[in-house]
Curated annotation (Swiss-Prot):
Keywords from the named record: Glycoprotein, Lyase, Signal
Name used for this protein in its record: Hydroalkoxylation enzyme phnH
Superkingdom in the source lineage: Eukaryota
Native source species: Penicillium herquei
Top enzyme category: lyase
Primary role: Hydroalkoxylation enzyme; part of the gene cluster that mediates the biosynthesis of phenalenones such as herqueinone, compounds that have been reported to treat tumors, bacterial infections and/or mycoses, and rheumatic diseases. The non-reducing polyketide synthase phnA synthesizes the heptaketide backbone and cyclizes it into the angular, hemiketal-containing naphtho-gamma-pyrone prephenalenone. The product template (PT) domain of phnA catalyzes only the C4-C9 aldol condensation, which is unprecedented among known PT domains.
The keyword Glycoprotein belongs to this UniProt entry's keyword annotation: yes
Domain note: The extensive N-terminal loop participates in forming interface between the subunits of the homotetramer.
Length: 149
């Protein structure tokens, strides 16, 4: 029985190593032009700087919905090597009145995005994993978001 298990495990490993995962496709979701308030540094050392920043507004535009950013917060950490990690939560209100909570986790300039809404019309977003990035690194308040398929 042990031998059969080992043979099965070896066969699985050979099959897995011989196949290549399929890269995901990206479908454009929306662009966001975010407005931010002042950043408040709440922890600073030689190793890092941590800050809290409010998201005070913004415009959302895309092929499936558009709206405004009602508000939110972003926590960021800048390491001594210049890397920036950030986590943000903000609320979008669509032009037809639906509310969508956006949760972001970023290693700047790349952003992983999840959505949460109780709207029947936009319920499909609850199953979307998205990726965002600024098209121009000099304009990090403007981001484009892509659905990972």
């Amino acid at each position: 029985m042990k031998f059969t298990y080992l043979v099965s495990l070896a066969a699985f490993a050979v099959t897995a190593l011989g196949s290549r995962p399929t890269p995901p496709n990206l479908e454009f979701l929306f662009s966001a032009n975010l407005t931010k308030g002042p950043a408040y540094i709440y922890d600073q050392s030689d190793a890092q700087i941590k800050a809290l920043q409010t998201l005070t507004g913004g415009i959302i535009a895309g092929p499936n919905f558009d709206g405004t950013v009602i508000g939110g917060t972003a926590l960021s950490t800048r390491g001594a090597d210049g890397t920036i990690r950030a986590d943000a939560h903000y609320l979008i209100q669509t032009s037809d009145g639906a509310n969508i909570l956006v949760t972001e986790s970023a290693a700047i300039p790349y952003v992983a995005v999840l959505f949460d809404t109780s709207s029947e019309k936009y319920n499909w977003l609850n199953n979307v994993t998205a990726w965002g990035t600024p098209p121009n690194l000099n304009e990090i308040n403007f981001l484009e978001y892509w659905q990972i398929e």
